[in-house]
A protein has these predicted regions:
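N-terminal, membrane-interfacial amphipathic/helix-forming hydrophobic leader that caps
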Residues: 1-82, 93, 196, 211-259
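Internal alpha-helical transmembrane segments of multi-pass membrane proteins, especially GPCRs
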Residues: 14, 18, 83-86, 132, ...
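Detector for Asparagine
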Residues: 24, 35-38, 62, 98, ...
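Short helix-terminus and kink motifs of transmembrane alpha helices
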Residues: 28, 32, 96-103, 146-147, ...
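Juxtamembrane helix-loop-helix connectors linking adjacent transmembrane helices
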Residues: 36-41, 69-143
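Transmembrane helix-loop-helix hairpins at the membrane interface
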Residues: 127-259
Length: 259
């Protein structure tokens, strides 16, 4: 890597770090000003945080770059979108087993990550948290990680851009339960971005958060625990099997085009 490339990489990482710092400062400031009765259940502070994050990116990019962020490279078919949903189901299954394994290991040391898992998988309790979790978070995260970071990393190679942005996306989630899942999800969203366009990655991210996380959890609450487990296993298991099948097909037919 040449000196100029290293300088550009450092600049990109500093902008990304500045976004995360601004995000957290905005949350703290909003909490101190609004002083909500139940801070953990209010999504309003996160509205300001996403705005601060996007403002940093806006300042750090020129108009040409801002337009290019939303370039569309290919129009996906309905069948392709279904494949992506199957991949989401596969990542959810991986997340479930990973969470169980981590919990077993932590319990051995009299620790637990149960609260982290519940916060990552449960339905949002308030309208503001639903709006943030289902729409604003996917939009803001995709603009930062796939729209800004990945696009800047592409000058060092597509494979590097997808993997490194996915690693940063995993670290960003900040806990041992979500990080592996976020990394795998980041790989999928990175592939979608470079192959089809950022707006499709945003759509898939919204579908994951709103449908597979929030709506599905609310739907399962209508049933007894045993029945809900069976329904969840059938739905996610079917998607995961489809994900494995499409992953096998991709590995044998499409990987050379990307790598």
């Amino acid at each position: 890597m040449e000196k100029t490339e290293r300088k550009d990489l450092k600049k990109t990482l500093w902008v990304g770090l500045s976004c995360l710092i601004a995000f957290n400062i905005a949350i703290l400031q909003a909490l101190s000003i609004l002083n909500p009765e139940n801070p953990d259940e209010s999504g309003v502070p996160y509205f300001f945080a996403v705005a601060a994050e996007l403002f940093i990116i806006f300042v750090a990019t020129n108009k040409k770059t801002q337009r290019q962020i939303f370039d569309v490279y290919c129009q996906p078919t309905a069948a392709k979108f279904f494949q992506w949903v199957c991949f989401l189901g596969l990542t959810q299954i991986i997340f479930s087993y990973n969470s169980t394994l981590i919990e077993m290991l932590l319990n051995f040391f009299h620790l637990s990550a149960q609260n982290q898992e519940e916060s990552a998988t449960g339905a949002n309790e308030t309208l503001s948290m639903f709006i943030y979790g289902s729409f604003l978070a996917p939009f803001g995260e995709e603009i930062l990680f796939r729209g800004f970071l990945l696009q800047n990393f592409k000058r060092y190679g597509v494979r590097f851009a997808i993997i490194f942005s996915a690693i940063l996306f995993g670290i960003y989630h900040g806990n041992i339960v979500q990080t592996p899942f976020a990394f795998i999800l980041g790989l999928l969203l990175g592939y979608i971005t470079v192959s089809y366009g950022l707006k499709y990655a945003i759509a898939v991210h919204i579908f994951n958060n709103m449908v597979l996380a929030d709506f599905l959890d609310r739907f399962l609450q209508l049933f007894s625990e045993n029945t809900a487990t069976i329904i969840s296993t059938i739905i996610m298991g079917s998607l995961a099997l489809g994900g494995l099948y499409y992953l096998y097909r991709f590995w044998h037919t499409q990987r050379q085009k990307l790598f």
